[in-house]
Amino acid sequence: MIVEINNKAYQAKEGDNLEDVIKQNFKQKNIVAAKVNDKLTDLSDCIKDNSKVELVTTNDHDGLNILRHSCAHLFGHAIKQLHPETQMVIGPVIDNGFYYDILTENPLTEKDLPLIENRMRKLAKKNYTIRREVISKEDAIAIFEARNEPYKVELLKEIPNDEVIALYH
């Protein structure tokens, strides 16, 4: 099948994912997503048919938000590694970055910030992969109940049943 990426045609096989096709044809390192037929999509998504693809980089508004979203997840992973007892609440992207609400036995202080930053850098340096997985609401609730994450369970229960639930792990 033919995949048009940034107005140039490339050959792809059914089942190829965007990331593989992009890696084979582009040297750019700051590609974080793609718009497939004008729909923002994850690079791990498979190519289903002839498509028009626009690459999204960290220089783009959508790309910057994806980078911030990834940083929030990296922060969450770093916190859980440093403080496994921490309850994760919510970590949304905002205009100038992101924040993460957490509940921990011992409140974080200024002294904790370099430790968290260093852990995030270590994870990033070793190419710590955070993958998106779409699952059912029931499965997501079961996962967070098993992890003893009541705030995540509460948030999931508030989401309408027809919404797509994606976990990043």
Range-by-range predicted roles:
Residues 45-66, 87-93, 99-169:
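Auxiliary tRNA-acceptor-end handling modules of aminoacyl-tRNA synthetases
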Residues 1-72, 76-97, 115-122:
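Ubiquitin-like/PB1-type beta-grasp interaction modules and other compact soluble beta-rich domains
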